[in-house]
């Protein structure tokens, strides 16, 4: 299963040392190029930079082939939604209210960092039972 992530879910999970849960729950995590840029910005936490030095198995960076400039969102949310559509992702991980609403309007399954993980999309792994 492919899931595309916006910046905030990755930031939060890195901050609490739980980033490895994403590929265990969802399989392949696609990180948009604009999200990668935010994760390694000058003011990014050091934990982000250490993690990005060697991107673990289960994570890959991709650029969207086309960005919908009509989406009134920041660059990372826009690219996450467009990439999720292009890759026919099972879900998009996004926390911001406006981005979540637009993703849902476009027919995407939306998962947030906390609340929506009760039933991850098509999760078949036994890891979920451990949470």
PLM segments and residue spans:
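Active-site-proximal, substrate-binding regions of enzyme catalytic domains
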Residues: 1-91, 97, 104-108
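Acidic, PIN/NYN-like endoribonuclease modules and their adjacent C-terminal/linker elements
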Residues: 35-36, 100-131
